[in-house]
Amino acid sequence: MKNVPKIWTVAELTREIGQTLNDNPDFVNCWVSGEISNYKNHRPSGHWYFTLKDEQSSMKGVMFRSRAERVRFTPQDGMKVLVRGSIRIYERDGTIQLYAEEMQPSGVGALYLAFEQLKERLGQEGLFAPERKKAIPRYPRRIGIVTSPTGAAIKDILKVMFRRNPQISWILAPAAVQGELAPKEVAQAIARLNRHSQVDVIIVGRGGGSLEELWAFNTEEVARAIAASGIPVISAVGHETDVTIADMVADLRAPTPSAAAELAVPVWRELKSDLEQLEARLHSTMSSQLQRKRQRLDSLKTIGPLSNPFWRIDQNRQRLDSLSERVEQGMTRFVSDKNGILKLLTAKLDLLSPLAILGRGYSLTYGPKGNVLRKSDDINVGQQVQVRLQQGILTCAVLAKSVDSD
């Protein structure tokens, strides 16, 4: 009897292949080299999806957000990389997929590549442009310092500051300067000094170290905090040969923390000398101005109104007399005009006055109730009426009445 071949379902076969891959240590935590293509940073999950290929084959890959956040550079299509991860089956599609744990550029360090990528991007935004850099104040009253409170940098900075000016005031905004928390703490310290506005210039830096130890000052978070600062920033990171992104964004770069203190704090003796020179210049300027004013006064005494102090008084008296005469003439004309208007109005009132009408021979007749009689029907025969003349009143009795035929 022949052996009956086993018939697999697609799901069973996929799971079996996946288990075989999982059981093979060569496919767990292995390194794969290839070229990135179809790279996509999925939003909002933050997972990376890509294809890893060479001249003969290709394989899909995924790096989840928790791992992708640790990669110092941004993958790009065409970039050759080394990827560490595990080979597994994506059961839904039945495809082999690389689940990446780590990624580094092939042939160049990951930190160097990240540095160059950020440098190019910020440069295109204009963050390194000379015209956006702020001037460092010549006579700062208080210095802000962003560094570790226990490192060598703070000691070097304070030593130089007090040597140059024992009276200088300073504020330390403590921050970690290496490690995963360093970028956030440095950026927050810069923002805090800006928020309180108690310093005139900020020194940001640390002592020397490896590229990894200095990396906080090559991050975008610190670079943007420096760029956003309304207070001038002096960067002082590492040794003279170390150049960071923070140095490029800062308003002034110092090769060391000690040099930053030299640039920020003027020497007390030089400051005193500058004040003495300013005092001398002020005295000279005031003396010159006073001398010119005296010469001008002397000139006015001989050729101007001051040569005769009563000259201006006489001029004003004549002007006052002229104005008084003009006011008097104006008032006379005003009164005359008003008298004429008054006479005209009086004449018009006389024409309308009832007394004036009576003066021309007319009279007013009032009935028993004091009402003015306008027609004969308003009174009866035998009733008394009062007749108002221009001068005097007559009391009369009505003997008869008639109506005009008109």
Swiss-Prot record:
Its EC number is 3.1.11.6. Belongs to the XseA family. Its main location: cytoplasm. Heterooligomer composed of large and small subunits. Keywords: Cytoplasm, Exonuclease, Hydrolase, Nuclease. Transmembrane segments: none annotated. One of its GO terms (biological process) is DNA catabolic process. It comes from Desulfitobacterium hafniense (strain Y51). This is Exodeoxyribonuclease 7 large subunit. Bidirectionally degrades single-stranded DNA into large acid-insoluble oligonucleotides, which are then degraded further into small acid-soluble oligonucleotides. It is found in: Cytoplasm. One of its GO terms (molecular function) is nucleic acid binding. The gene is xseA. It catalyses: Exonucleolytic cleavage in either 5'- to 3'- or 3'- to 5'-direction to yield nucleoside 5'-phosphates. GO terms for cellular component: cytoplasm; exodeoxyribonuclease VII complex.
